């Protein structure tokens, strides 16, 4: 059959044309023939009159026209459906495309299909918008949009509108690859798509400033550690914000050293900041993210190296150039390591100064002394020299050992009245002696008899050196004894450690002792081995890694639920102990609040009130006997030499 003249309107071409047919009529005629369109002089015939629809509405011919319109609509819908079936990807193809977007390398080594759940894309190739208004962008990988005709394979390009709140300024560190097929930006895209974003930022920093970031800072593993000085490097900052940060940062800081560089990523802001108060990394990150209008992941934030001379010289030299903006007073750690006068002021560590500090603050624990003394490095030259030393552990141990020797010698030289005065001088609060007396009366203890026994107890009279408080549980025996022990700075021994040879060693370094909650087995042990201890006579104590020590037992208090006088097996202890019975439950004014509070201030007032009745020496008598009252000093004084 001979082909029809005009355009070949196949279904495929029709679909490509969007569902419309453009048919050209080719008419051949001789030169002598004239077409009806060209014959302008010919008069109109009756057939031409039907071209104009001049029928009267309502004559019954509307139904065929509506039917014809419906047929045309059905044909158009069928054409659209054919287009959809041709270009919409199949489920398998769509899943593979999603997995390819997630990780092309991972998809290349995959042996089977992965999960069909939609996942977040790791690598986006959309160009970052300006942040203002609605932005229409084309989403698709470079492989999907290659070619001149979008209908030639691949997935369709998804055109969408992204509504963004203008002015957020958040720009991603990804670069849109041009679709020209060139590899000019391929290396940059590969670098930015690396999984370790921090390594990428560190590499860019060294490229811009010529020095490693970690050569200027020290690392804080915890983001909750507070520090006043911070080094901040922010990437991809807008130009206007980078220029305005010089003014925006001033209300928050005392000192700022700001350097601004231009790179392929945009503006890079490098700052050394000293805040008005100490802040942690999380707080600094949120503050800088708000001021610079960038996400927190685009910043490197660490504290500076305070004892590194090269780092201090870097900040000092860059502050003198025209590429830095500096305001505020230079931090002392930079001044100390860069100026000659301050460098010569560094002195050697003196152990005696550290020992004096431990003695004055009553620190006999190595950990506590190390923590407290290290905090003085900014204001004390000897503490700074201690931190700069490589023998901190040795100095610390020696200082605590010497402090204990001084404290022990001072305690042994004091009488009980001097010791009570010394302990009372450490308490500045004013108390009341009445709660102690009321508590003893509440337990049925006669106050006069208690004072008489307490007087002999403090003097260490033989056979009167031990006081026992016994009675039912929850009567306040331990509460009463612990409060007195805390005021006098005594020691506690426990029968649970009786299997050790050294369980009595704490009594050698105290003026008073306490054995809490003695059981029947404990009383049997005391009756067997510790009769001489209850007498108040000298006895021998075994100390760890030291020779035996012969001392007089300090006054000892014992709390128990058993009356040792009622047991015949302990009859030899009856003359060695003084008993007071607590019978009534401990009174409370409210839950957790005792009715009769007994604290250090109340014990101080109690001893001042009953000083003469306890036959204690007055402070005036102590000064007359040679006690000058001057504080102990182990640091040699400076001698003024005349020229």
Swiss-Prot record:
PTMs per UniProt: Phosphorylated. Sumoylated.
Compositional bias of kind Acidic residues: 36-45
Domain SF3 helicase: 445-595
Catalytic activity annotation: Couples ATP hydrolysis with the unwinding of duplex DNA by translocating in the 3'-5' direction; ATP + H2O = ADP + phosphate + H(+)
Region ranges (Disordered): 28-60, 119-179
Covalent cross-link Glycyl lysine isopeptide (Lys-Gly) (interchain with G-Cter in SUMO) as placed by the record, residue numbers: 552
Segments carrying motif Nuclear export signal: 102-111
Motif extent (Nuclear localization signal): 84-86
PROSITE patterns: SF3_HELICASE_1 (PS51206)
EC code(s) of this entry: 5.6.2.4
Main location: host cell
Region (DNA-binding region): 180-346
GO terms of molecular function: ATP binding; ATP hydrolysis activity; DNA binding; DNA helicase activity
Transmembrane segments annotated in the record for this chain: none
Quaternary context: Can form hexamers. Interacts with E2 protein; this interaction increases E1 DNA binding specificity. Interacts with host DNA polymerase subunit POLA2. Interacts with host single stranded DNA-binding protein RPA1. Interacts with host TOP1; this interaction stimulates the enzymatic activity of TOP1.
Function: ATP-dependent DNA 3'-5' helicase required for initiation of viral DNA replication. It forms a complex with the viral E2 protein. The E1-E2 complex binds to the replication origin which contains binding sites for both proteins. During the initial step, a dimer of E1 interacts with a dimer of protein E2 leading to a complex that binds the viral origin of replication with high specificity. Then, a second dimer of E1 displaces the E2 dimer in an ATP-dependent manner to form the E1 tetramer.
Name of this protein: Replication protein E1
Organism whose genome encodes this protein: Human papillomavirus 57
Phylogenetic classification of the source organism: Viruses, Monodnaviria, Shotokuvirae, Cossaviricota, Papovaviricetes
Gene: E1
């Amino acid at each position: 059959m001979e082909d029809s003249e005009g355009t070949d309107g196949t279904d495929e071409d029709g679909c490509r044309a969007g569902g419309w047919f453009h048919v050209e009529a080719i008419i051949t005629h001789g030169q002598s023939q004239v077409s009806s369109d060209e014959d302008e002089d010919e008069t109109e015939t009756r057939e031409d009159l039907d071209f104009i629809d001049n029928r009267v509405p309502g004559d019954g011919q509307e139904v065929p026209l509506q039917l014809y319109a419906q047929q045309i609509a059905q044909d158009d819908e069928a054409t659209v459906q054919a287009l959809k079936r041709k270009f919409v990807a199949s489920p398998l193809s769509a899943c593979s495309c999603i997995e390819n977007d997630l990780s092309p390398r991972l998809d290349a080594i995959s042996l089977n299909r992965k999960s069909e759940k939609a996942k977040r894309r790791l690598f986006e190739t959309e160009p970052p918008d300006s942040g203002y208004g609605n932005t229409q962008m084309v989403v698709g990988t470079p492989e999907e949009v290659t070619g001149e005709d979008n209908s030639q394979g691949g997935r369709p390009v998804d055109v969408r509108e992204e509504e963004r709140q203008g002015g957020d300024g958040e720009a991603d560190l990804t670069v849109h690859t041009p679709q020209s097929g060139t590899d000019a930006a391929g290396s940059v895209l590969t670098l930015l798509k690396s999984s370790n974003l921090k390594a990428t930022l560190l590499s860019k920093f060294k490229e811009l400033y010529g020095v490693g970031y970690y050569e200027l800072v020290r690392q804080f593993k915890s983001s909750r550690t507070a520090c006043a000085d911070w080094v901040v490097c922010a990437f991809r900052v807008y130009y206007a914000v980078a220029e305005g940060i010089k003014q925006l940062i001033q209300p928050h800081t005392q000192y700022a050293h700001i350097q601004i560089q231009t790179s392929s990523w945009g503006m890079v802001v490098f700052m050394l900041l000293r805040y008005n108060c100490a802040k942690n990394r999380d707080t600094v990150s949120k503050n800088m993210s708000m001021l610079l209008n960038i996400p927190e992941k685009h910043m490197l934030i660490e504290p500076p190296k305070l004892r590194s001379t090269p780092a201090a010289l870097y900040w000092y030299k860059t502050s003198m150039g025209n590429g830095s903006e500096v305001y505020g007073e230079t931090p002392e750690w930079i001044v100390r390591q860069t100026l000659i006068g301050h460098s010569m002021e560094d002195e050697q560590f003196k152990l005696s100064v550290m020992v004096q500090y431990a003695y004055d603050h009553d620190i006999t624990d190595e950990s506590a002394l190390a923590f407290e003394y290290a905090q003085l490095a900014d204001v004390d030259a000897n503490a700074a020299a201690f931190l700069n030393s490589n023998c901190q552990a040795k100095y610390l141990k020696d200082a605590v050992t010497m402090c204990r020797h001084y404290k022990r010698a001072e305690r042994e030289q004091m009488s009980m009245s001097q010791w009570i005065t010394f302990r009372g001088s450490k308490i500045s609060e004013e108390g009341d002696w009445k709660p102690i007396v009321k508590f003893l009366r509440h337990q049925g203890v006669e106050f006069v008899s208690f004072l008489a026994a307490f007087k002999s107890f403090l003097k260490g009279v033989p056979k009167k050196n031990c006081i026992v408080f016994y009675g039912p549980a929850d009567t306040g025996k331990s509460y009463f004894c612990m409060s007195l022990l805390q005021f006098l700075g005594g020691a506690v021994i426990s029968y649970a450690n009786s299997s050790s040879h050294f369980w009595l060693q704490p009594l050698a370094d105290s003026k008073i002792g306490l054995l809490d909650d003695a059981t029947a087995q404990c009383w049997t042990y005391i009756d067997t081995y510790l009769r001489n201890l209850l007498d108040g006579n000298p006895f021998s104590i075994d100390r760890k890694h030291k020779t035996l020590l012969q001392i007089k037992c300090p006054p000892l208090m014992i709390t128990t639920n058993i009356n040792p006088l009622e047991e015949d097996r302990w009859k030899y202890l009856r003359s060695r102990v003084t008993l007071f019975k607590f019978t009534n439950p401990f009174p409370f004014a409210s839950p957790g609040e005792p009715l009769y509070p007994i604290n250090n201030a109340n014990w101080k007032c109690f001893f001042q009130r009953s000083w003469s009745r306890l036959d204690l020496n007055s402070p005036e008598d102590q000064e007359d006997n040679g006690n000058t009252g001057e504080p102990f000093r182990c640091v040699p004084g400076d001698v003024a030499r005349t020229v």
